């Protein structure tokens, strides 16, 4: 299982939690309090091989050790699903029985692997059939280009082109912090994604609203204990790194079955 950790050259906002955002959603306050007490270590931190990470060369992909058994779902984590039908950074029915939350960085090579190899399978097998909803969270950890790419993704969403931009950005492996996500290339990606109003795209990228939205996503991830990308929650069950596709399929199937059982039990109790 593999993921990426920030390099030592990452900007301060990408290497440690940003300050509290006024835009943090009130609906998750109680859930995050639960997470701070229990899920932070149980959900993500214990899946990291801390010793290996300390020995690793800065900027190289972080080795991740899988748990012997799947981590259980957590009620606080379940509450993080936004289920906002108008969210342009989400795909799938808002009332889908399973929600996968993804914390990713556009410069993360393992996020790219997930986007190219696993996500298309999940879309075909579960999203298109109404079983799964995928909600994106911007989690830039590799410096200025990561942050600019996150802002660009948010701006693309303002014109309902986030997923098109996502597919272009992850369309091929790109070297980190080499200009692949500089201003000129981000505009080129926006054009390729079919974004019509480039001036609006650039203005949205530079807006305080964009920075606030990205910061709120980062804060959510940091509160969970996320330190590398990609990281996922499948109906509250944590998965860290670019696991094989069947790992995600198993998680979705298990979550869908549990949701169906819960609905049946709830209906019988009425």
What are these regions (language model features)?
Residues 1-63, 68, 192-270:
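C-terminal cap of thioredoxin/glutaredoxin-like
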Residues 81-98:
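A short beta-strand-turn-helix
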Residues 89-91, 181, 239:
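Short clusters of hydrophobic/aromatic residues that line enzyme substrate/ligand-binding pockets
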Residues 85-88, 119-121, 217-220:
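A generic local structural motif
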Residues 96, 104-107, 112-191, 270:
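Structural alpha/beta surface segment adjacent to cysteine/selenocysteine redox centers
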Residues 102-105, 226:
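Processing junctions and N-termini across compartments
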Residues 68-84:
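Short coil-to-helix leader/linker segments, especially the first N-terminal amphipathic alpha-helix
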């Amino acid at each position: 299982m593999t993921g990426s950790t920030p390099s030592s050259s990452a900007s301060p906002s990408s290497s440690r939690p940003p300050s509290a955002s006024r835009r943090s959603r009130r609906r998750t306050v109680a859930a995050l309090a639960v997470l701070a007490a229990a899920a932070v270590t149980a959900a993500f931190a214990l899946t990291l091989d801390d010793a290996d990470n300390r020995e690793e060369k800065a900027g190289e992909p972080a080795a991740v050790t899988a748990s012997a058994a799947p981590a259980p779902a957590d009620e606080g984590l379940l509450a993080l699903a936004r289920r906002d039908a108008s969210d342009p950074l989400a795909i799938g029915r808002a009332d889908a029985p399973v929600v996968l939350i993804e914390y990713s960085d556009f410069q993360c090579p393992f996020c790219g692997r997930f986007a190219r190899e696993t996500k298309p399978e999940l879309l075909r097998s579960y999203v298109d059939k109404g079983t799964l909803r995928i909600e994106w969270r911007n989690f830039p950890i590799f410096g200025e280009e990561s942050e600019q790419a996150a802002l660009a993704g948010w701006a693309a969403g303002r014109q309902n082109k986030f997923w098109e931009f996502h597919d272009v950005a992850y369309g091929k492996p790109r070297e980190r912090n080499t200009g692949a996500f500089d201003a000129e290339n981000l505009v080129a990606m926006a054009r390729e994604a079919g974004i019509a109003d480039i001036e609006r795209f650039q203005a949205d990228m530079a807006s305080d609203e964009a920075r606030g939205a990205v910061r709120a996503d980062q804060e959510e991830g940091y509160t969970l204990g996320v330190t590398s990308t990609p990281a996922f929650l499948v109906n509250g069950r944590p998965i860290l790194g670019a696991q094989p596709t069947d790992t995600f399929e198993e998680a979705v199937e298990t979550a869908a079955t549990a949701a169906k059982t819960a609905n049946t039990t709830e209906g019988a109790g009425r």
